[in-house]
A protein has these predicted regions:
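Bacterial Sec-dependent N-terminal signal peptides
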Residues: 15-32
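Structured domain cores in non-transmembrane regions
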Residues: 27-33, 42-156, 160
């Protein structure tokens, strides 16, 4: 009986130990690799579905500190955001980011030159929706954007999303929901099909979230999500 009791106690201790280790955060470090997986839920069942080839376009962005913002609601879009939101190309945005890398405000550039597509869309420009990037404690914020294609000047993205918690530790996993934004470049009044580009807005409008009140023909609501998962060394 004594031997049996000892075996049971050893097994119980082992079980508690395993559960504790599973709940403990990984060892704190100064840098962390994250896996980002993009899920596109914008599809033919969405309101005002524009086109059978609708997708998220190139993804561009960076890790950075709080001294810089590459886009922000309520402010005018930069030329790089302009080009991205209208054409899907992130080339000018990457140049803006590189300038902030040189200024010491950004660190790692995120650039994926392919489409992120909803399930069921088979197109030669669609690629794997998973990529990795590195974040450091010195540059813990992540901003990345992608045009809603086709659209006048609409996009999705993250803006200064922190990958560290209030205690300064890297967040193990996070799901970020993607809402549509209007870059304020093209005068889209919600009457025409979303793929038609009317004259440029003069004056240029501020970047804003697309809501039922803003009058665009897309959304509103969540069009996808990005799942971030830490990948400890």
């Amino acid at each position: 009986m004594g031997k049996l009791k000892l075996i049971v106690m050893v097994a119980l201790v082992a079980t508690i130990s395993c559960e504790k280790n599973a709940e403990e955060p990984f060892e704190d470090t100064d840098s962390m690799t994250y896996v980002a997986e993009v899920y596109v839920t914008w599809n033919s069942e969405s309101p005002a579905w524009p086109d059978k080839d609708a997708h998220f376009s190139w993804m561009g962005g960076a890790t950075h500190n709080a001294n810089v913002k590459f886009w922000e609601i309520g402010t005018l879009a930069s030329p790089g955001i302009d080009l991205m939101s209208i054409t899907g190309l992130t080339t000018d945005l990457i140049l803006e980011i590189q300038a902030e890398v040189d200024n010491g405000n950004a660190e790692n550039i995120i650039s994926r030159r392919h489409w992120f597509c909803p399930r069921g869309l088979f197109h030669r420009l669609c690629r794997e929706p998973i990529f990795e990037f590195e974040v450091t404690k010195e540059f813990p914020l992540v901003s990345m954007v992608s045009m809603l294609g086709p659209s006048p000047d609409w996009f999705i993205g993250t803006e200064s999303l922190s990958m560290v918690d209030n205690n300064g530790r890297f967040i193990p996993a996070m799901t970020y929901e993607l809402y549509p934004y209007d870059a304020g470049i093209v005068s889209d009044n919600g009457v025409n099909d979303c793929c038609d580009r009317e004259p440029l807005s003069i004056p240029q409008q501020n970047v804003h979230l697309i809501t039922p009140e803003t009058g665009e023909t897309i959304g509103p609501g969540i069009l996808g999500r990005i799942v971030f998962t830490a990948k400890p060394e």
